[in-house]
Every structure is written in C-alpha cells, then in structure tokens.
C-alpha cells in the first residue's frame, strides 16, 4: 500500500466515511444478542452545525465506538429534533415571515417544506464529522411515530393524575409569545438602571423605594417592610400612593423585605418575579396585570399604553424625573433570567397551561438518580442540585403552531376535558372531532 506524500484530511475523511457506509459497520443488527443502546437527544434543526454540536455529540460517539470495540451490538440511531419553537424561529428567519401573521395550516406547511429543503445538508454535516450513527435508520420528532409516542406518554401521565391544567402566573416569553419552563431559562448579565423613587403617604410625607423595573409601578399592589426594621415600623398598616399612577397600596410587615437591599422597602407587583407571585397569593391580593402577551403595556398603564416594556421603562424614568419623584438613578449590571431560545427577559403572565407534577416527586427523582452510574460521579451531584433547585412544576404547553398537539378536546358547554383513545393516536384535535363525549 502506497502512502500519499502529503496527508489530505478532506480526501481521507471522505474515503473512510464512505467505507463505513458501504461496509455497514455502524448498522444495527437486531438479530445479535448483546445490545448497547445510546439514547441521545436528537440535535435541533435550527441552522448550521456549530462547535457546540460537535463537542457534545462527539462524547456520545466515543462511548458508542468503545462498546463496538467490545464486540457489542450498538443501537445508535440518528434523529432530528425538527418541531417546536427552535424550528419555528428558524423558518421565520429564513422565510422572513411571522407565525402570528399566518394561519396555523399555512405555517405548518411552510415549516414542513423548509425542513425538507435543509434537512439533507444538516444530516450530511453530521456524517462529515465522522459520527458513527446508523444513518440508515433516521427519525424525526415530528414524524407520526414520535407524535404517537409523545401523545401516548401524555395519556399515561393524565391517567396517573401526574399532569394537570391550571391558570396561574407562569414564565412567559414576550418575543416568542409562549409559556416556557424553568429548564428553558438562562442567566444573563444585562445593563440596567437602579432607581430610587418617592411614594407618598397619607400625610403627604414621602418614602423611598428602589427598583430596577419602573414599568411595573402601574402593577404595584402592596409594599413590604421588615418587621424588625426600626426605620419603618411606624409605616405598617398605612397606605402609600404609587408615583405617576396614583393607586393606593397597603404597607405590610413581612420578613421577605431585606433591610440591607436598596432602601429596605419592597414593592410587590403583578408580576415582577416568582416572589411577587408568592406574595400576592399569600395576601390574596387582586393583581393588576399591565403587560400584554406580546410585551406591551395595556390600558392600566395610562399614557404608556401600547409601548413595549423597554420603551415604557425609559419614558417612565423620564416622567419621574420631570415630576421630581426620582430620587436617585445609577447604572448597574445584574443577572436576569432570559429565554434560552431568543435571549429575551422573561415575564410572569397569568395564563392557562398544562403542567407535570414535579415538586411533589422530587425525592423520587433523586432516588432514581442514585440508581444510575454517573461518569464522572460529580454529575450526579449536579443532577441532584438541579432537582432540588426546581421551584415550579414543569410547564409543558406552548402557544405555537408547529409541534406535537395535546390529544385532548374541551367541551364547549362545560369545558370538561375529552381525552383521545390510545387507538386513535397520532391525532390532531384541531382537524379531528372526538369520538367520545364528556
């Protein structure tokens, strides 16, 4: 065998990739006995491959190759995650459209067409980096088999009463206009203003409250001071008038107010964060919802109606300054939760969503994790910390066009849930009438 004078990686890699395919080296043979399965989440069809793809999936490939070297029958298929929010955002970008401006049927067809146009090149990218999957058996998360599997899982959870629908404040992305789960969040450091503003007491005296979110002044429903904070004990039980918007709010004693943060006085709004949600539920207060689902202010915000959140923030700060209600303003950097898909700061909006019961089953998840062999072992601890840190049940519903539909209907008369029969799966409730009655 003659070796070339100069190694050409492109020629060599393509040669051996073709050899692997022709020889069927990576094909799964169901007739062999000892099977080692690699159950990997399929990569999202959301554009070109990047270094992060290669880094994470090469680790799985190392394991698959190791077990082949041990003469085990490796079951390692290649799939594509080509439904849901990432795919919708890609289609909107490539085709310069907005899903909210199209009918569901039109947009779904456009998504399917776009995926068919780009999928071959996407899969070839994975072949070209040398992934040792069985590419003769690919799957898609939007194919009938996967839809059926997903819908069957939902029905199983529904029968076990592990899934429920509930209207409550939940995390919301105003850019993508959908509810999101805690697992969809990322921390991001952003520039902001930390401002001190005057609230007026009944005797026209002023108290100062610090906030980074003046756009929520219209949503303020009460004020907290710490019971041991001597500066403000005399305020407990009194009312204060919110600057610019003039609604009167009660001042409560509560230990969640941190005397060392800002001015030590905390305004509770509907809804700035999960602590606001807890406080409003605790006091059974009537929320003042000022944000729309697309991230604009509504009529409760008065003259700021129809401004987006950032525009309103700027205008309100300017008006506070004009009215001599702005005590202080300083530039800061702080960590905020953003939606991992688009980088937009998340809000809390009251919407009706489906949830899987996570919080009441935390111990079960941790015990299940202990039965797994973790490599390296510290990843088990990371998993446990992640479970312990979950503070919300898992929101699984999304307000999108292109995805797996819930196999349910709602009775128009009584709003009862009508569940599809497992034999009907996969099913699209928007185009199919229920066989059962409520």
Segments (PLM) and residue ranges:
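Glycine-/proline-rich flexible loop or hinge segments
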Residues: 1-2, 40-49, 100-109, 301
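Non-catalytic terminal extensions that flank enzyme cores
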Residues: 1-48, 74, 327, 340
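Pocket-edge structural micro-motifs
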Residues: 5, 40, 199, 211, ...
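Residue patterns forming the tRNA-binding/recognition surfaces of aminoacyl-tRNA synthetases
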Residues: 15, 19-23, 92-206, 261, ...
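Glycine-/acidic-rich phosphate or pyrophosphate-binding loops and their flanking alpha/beta elements
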Residues: 25-27, 194-200, 248-257
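N-terminal catalytic cores of NTP/NDP-binding nucleotidyl/phosphoryl-transfer enzymes
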Residues: 28-90, 141, 150, 210-211, ...
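Protease-associated
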Residues: 207-268, 273-278
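Acidic, glycine-rich two-metal-ion catalytic cores of nucleic acid-processing enzymes
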Residues: 211-215, 432-438
């Amino acid at each position: 065998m003659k070796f070339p004078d100069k190694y050409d990686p492109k020629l060599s890699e393509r040669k051996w990739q073709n050899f692997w395919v022709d020889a069927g080296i990576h094909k799964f043979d169901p007739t062999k006995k000892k099977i080692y399965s690699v159950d990997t989440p399929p990569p999202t069809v959301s554009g070109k491959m990047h270094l992060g793809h290669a880094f994470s999936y090469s680790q799985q490939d190392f394991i698959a190759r190791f077990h082949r070297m041990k003469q085990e029958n490796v079951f390692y298929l290649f799939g594509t995650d080509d439904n849901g929010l990432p795919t919708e955002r890609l289609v909107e970008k490539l085709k310069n459209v907005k899903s909210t401006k199209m009918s569901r049927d039109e947009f779904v067809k456009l998504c399917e067409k776009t995926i068919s146009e780009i999928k071959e090149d996407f899969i070839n990218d994975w072949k070209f980096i040398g992934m040792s999957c069985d590419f003769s058996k690919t799957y898609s998360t939007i194919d009938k088999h996967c839809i059926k599997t997903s819908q069957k899982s939902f029905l199983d959870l529904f029968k076990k009463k592990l899934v429920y629908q509930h209207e409550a404040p939940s995390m919301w992305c105003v850019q993508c206009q959908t509810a999101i789960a805690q697992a969809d969040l990322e921390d991001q450091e952003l520039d902001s203003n930390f401002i001190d503003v005057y609230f007026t007491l009944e005797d026209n005296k002023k108290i100062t409250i610090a906030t980074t979110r003046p756009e929520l002044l219209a949503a303020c429903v009460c004020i907290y001071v710490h019971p041991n904070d001597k500066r403000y004990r005399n305020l407990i039980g009194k009312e204060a008038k919110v600057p610019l918007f003039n609604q009167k709010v009660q001042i409560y004693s509560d230990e969640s107010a941190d005397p060392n943060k800002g001015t030590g006085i905390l305004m509770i709004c509907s809804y700035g964060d999960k602590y606001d949600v807890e406080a409003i539920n605790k006091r059974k207060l009537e929320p003042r919802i000022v944000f729309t689902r697309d991230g604009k202010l509504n009529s409760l915000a008065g003259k700021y109606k129809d401004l987006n959140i950032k525009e309103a923030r700027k205008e309100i700060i300017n008006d506070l300054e004009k009215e001599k209600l702005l005590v202080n303003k300083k530039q800061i950097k702080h960590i905020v939760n953003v939606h991992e898909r688009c980088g937009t700061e998340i809000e809390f909006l009251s919407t009706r969503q489906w949830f899987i019961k996570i919080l009441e089953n935390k111990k079960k998840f941790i015990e299940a994790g202990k039965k797994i062999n973790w490599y390296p072992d510290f990843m088990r601890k990371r998993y446990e910390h992640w479970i312990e840190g979950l503070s919300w049940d898992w929101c699984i519903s999304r307000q999108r066009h292109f995805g797996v539909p819930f196999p349910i209907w709602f009775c128009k008369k009584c709003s009862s849930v009508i569940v599809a029969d497992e034999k009907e799966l996969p099913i699209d409730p928007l185009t199919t009438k229920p066989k059962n009655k409520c």
